[in-house]
Design a protein with these regions (language model features):
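Active-site beta->alpha loop and helix N-cap motifs at the rims of alpha/beta catalytic domains
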Residues: 47, 60-122, 255
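Catalytic cores of alpha/beta
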Residues: 25-34, 151-161, 203, 207-223
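Alpha/beta catalytic cores of nucleotide-metabolism and tRNA/nucleoside-modifying enzymes
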Residues: 76, 191-199, 208-257
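Active-site-adjacent beta->alpha loops and helix N-cap segments on the catalytic face
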Residues: 1-7, 50-59, 71-81, 101-107, ...
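N-terminal amphipathic alpha-helix/helix-capping segment at the start of soluble metabolic enzymes
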Residues: 1-18, 81-85, 256
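Glycine-rich beta-to-alpha transition loops that act as phosphate-gripper elements at the mouths
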Residues: 19-24, 94-102, 126-127, 147-151, ...
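Hydrophobic faces of well-ordered beta-strands that scaffold small-molecule active sites
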Residues: 14-18, 43-45, 91-95, 120-122, ...
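Glycine-rich phosphate-binding active-site loops on the catalytic face of alpha/beta enzymes
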Residues: 41-51, 117-121, 126-129, 171-177, ...
Length: 257
């Protein structure tokens, strides 16, 4: 069992997404620790990119603030290495293929292993092109996380059969952001996934309330929340950690209930 799968072994997982360097890395570190102390089972860390095509305005804004603040991939690597001294839950990077290519794919992925990153999510990487990264990820023991959006049963089955770490089920087509209602038939997608793999699956995109998180975790193995956390960070800045702590606790309590 990979370290990522182990995060799902003790019940439903809560997975927060946090953009590195928004508003600064010191605050990011405090937010990560606050999330873990209040029940986060796995942390998704966003490496900012100037053209984040999967993101809505909230996370796009976080990317731009971090980039304006001088964030770089190397600074994030050094930051994670330091964070790993006391943060023991699995951590994955979410970024874009161009970030990995421009750094050098093997150098990027081997550094992930060296600093304690357990997986990599590339939302702009089509399933058909994953072989560009998969052999290197396997060589260095970094899970390449598959995303499944609402699509045909055959395609869901195909992606699920080859998945590793966990499967990120996208709740609805479009970009990230909070939604008042999620209308996709996610239970059917999860059923197809489970017929094809034992790899756990978590649902993300659009989840912001404890009620939504519970509903998604009841269907799947966990809930992923990004924009709602980024909104707290944008609103409270360096005071965000205490607010994120409270929010994560409410979400984790909901999915446990």
């Amino acid at each position: 069992m990979s370290k990522i799968q182990d995060a799902f072994a003790h019940g439903k997982a809560f997975i927060p997404f946090i953009t590195c360097g928004d508003p600064d890395l010191e605050t990011t570190a405090k937010v990560v620790r606050a999330a873990v102390e209040n029940g986060a089972d796995l942390i998704e860390l966003g490496i900012p990119f100037s053209d984040p095509t999967a993101e809505g305005p909230v996370i796009q804004g976080a990317n731009l603030r971090a980039l304006r603040g001088g964030i770089t991939t190397d600074k994030i690597f050094a930051f994670v290495k330091e964070l790993r001294r006391d943060v023991k839950v699995p951590m994955v990077f979410m970024t874009y293929a161009n970030v990995v290519f421009s750094y050098g794919a093997e150098k990027f992925i081997s550094t992930c292993r060296d600093i304690g990153i357990d997986g990599l999510i590339l939302p702009d990487l089509p399933y058909e092109e994953k072989e560009e990264f998969l052999p290197t990820c396997r060589q260095y023991g970094v899970d390449l996380i598959s995303l499944i959006a609402p699509t045909s049963e055959n395609r869901i089955s195909m992606i699920a059969r080859e998945a590793e770490g966990f499967i990120y089920i996208v709740s609805s087509l479009g970009v990230t952001g909070t939604r008042s209602e999620i209308k996709t038939d996610l239970a059917s997608i999860v059923n197809v996934v489970r017929e094809n793999t034992k790899v756990p699956c978590a649902i993300g995109f659009g989840i912001s309330t404890p009620e939504q998180a519970k509903k998604m975790a009841d269907i799947s193995d966990g809930a992923i929340v990004g924009s709602a956390i980024i909104e707290l960070i944008e609103k409270y800045g360096t005071d965000a950690p205490e607010h994120v702590a409270e929010y994560v606790k409410s979400m984790k309590d909901a999915i446990r209930s």
